[in-house]
Amino acid sequence: MSRLIILLAILLSLDACTEQQPGEILRFDTVIENGMVLDGSGSEAIEVDVFIRAGEIVLIDELDSLSVNNELEIGQRIDASGHIVAPGFIDVHSHGDPLETPAFENFLAQGVTTITLGQDGYSPATENLSQWMNEVEAQGIGVNLAMFVGHGTLRELSGIGRDPIPTAEQMQRMLELLDSNLEVSFGMSTGLEYNPGLNAAEAELLALAEVAGRNNRVIMSHMRNEDDDAIEASLAELIAQGEYARVHVAHMKSVYGRGAARAEELLALMQAARERGYQITADVYPYNASYTGIGIVFPVWAKTQEQFDAALPARREELAEYLRNRVNLRNGPEATLLGTDPYTGKTLADLEQEMNMPFEDILIDIIGPQGASGAYFVMNDELQSRLLEDAYVGVSSDGSPTGFHPRGHGTFAKIIEEYVVKRESLALSEAVRKMTSFAADILGITDRGRVEVGQAADLIMFDPAAVRARATYPEPHELASGFELVLVNGEIAFKDGAGQSQRNGEVLRP
């Protein structure tokens, strides 16, 4: 009965929208027919056809019944029999350089039609983000792009750099830059575990949040410390910014935390904030290893090469002890898998054996704080899986076309393959909601993320049982499979396992 009610409501609303009269010649560029449509709302799939014109969904109806009283002119008909038709996925936290690798085939192959850049506090180093976006548009891009303004970049542009306290003039300049660039971006990102953002005090972050809130934008935060013994304080810092703006926890994790009960404690903190009127959301990726520069294990006073060189003569013993304790706390040297040459594919434990020296000495004498990047197996499956199940937690890849972590090529496929099909811990309709309408709501994107009349025709077609995340840590660049057709703005962008030469993406603006 509920299925019939949903279908009736859709059809009634669409009749009102389209105002088409019997006997008309109805022209459509594309019709996707015979599929089971998940509209992105979390409702169950219904069998209905989707009609597209000029890159937009213009009708949702049954083709056979529509053709009884109308003459139809259809450019192409796509038979989706036996497949799910859903909105294209939206990645709320992505990486990449669209001027260097504009195709973004890694995302298209896993059903992603919109990505977000300018993350972790870093955006293009320009005072006029709109100009850079125009360059991307002129070159063309394979997916849609939503931009963030990076807090760290704002610090650099306003002359603050790594200073802990801005001057009044610097602070005013930073606020002005944020305000002007929020006209074309969807929020501000912070990377408080990285330089220069880690130097920012609460007052600075609150002032920036006030500007973001005034523009109805979101704060997308790589929080100050994701370690299990510090994450409550990091959440509290972000929630305080929620007094002024919507706030979002990027790639939420509890490093070396354990168990579903621990996840419940963290989710309860966020729920308590919502009950006080704050708007706070989060995302996760479905892997138990993070990926970033090796500087993540170095102390705050030795993260840059300059800091490291200055500290080493007097504090070498202290640094060695810090590194030894921190790496062991993060599941030991065998849990750090390096992903950059000449160490690619080797753990710190492997290097210990090869070089016959303690890993802390290898980090100090050979690698240094900026000499490598790697995957860190520091997350607990039970904890992360419980986070994923929460209604206010979405999905991101935190990945890129060129990164050495499988999340950049596999995240969205793995959600379907692992959590929907194998574990059955997420209903397909809920998984799709997290990756479509919920993601759009987090970002403030109003014209994507749903199969509705008036929405952009970013659509995907797949058989859930056939979806595979093929990327692995040894082979992180293997494309996902199972997403047979991906439309971006009404045009085919990915088909039969390959991207198309035409780039159909748009650079989105609020």
What are these regions (language model features)?
Residues 35, 308-309, 313-314, 386-392, ...:
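C-terminal cap of metal-dependent C-N hydrolases
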Residues 209-210, 220-248, 377-448, 452-453, ...:
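Extended hydrophobic/aromatic segments used for targeting, binding, or gating
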Residues 185-237:
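Divalent metal-binding pocket/active-site signature
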Residues 11-69, 431, 466-474:
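N-terminal metal-binding scaffold of metallo-dependent hydrolase/deaminase domains
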Residues 37-49, 374-384, 428-432, 440-477:
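Acidic, glycine-enriched loop/beta-strand segments at the rims
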Residues 80-85, 96, 100-190, 210, ...:
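Divalent-metal coordination cores built from histidine and acidic residues
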Residues 148-149, 153, 157, 161-168, ...:
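Active-site neighborhoods of metal-dependent hydrolases
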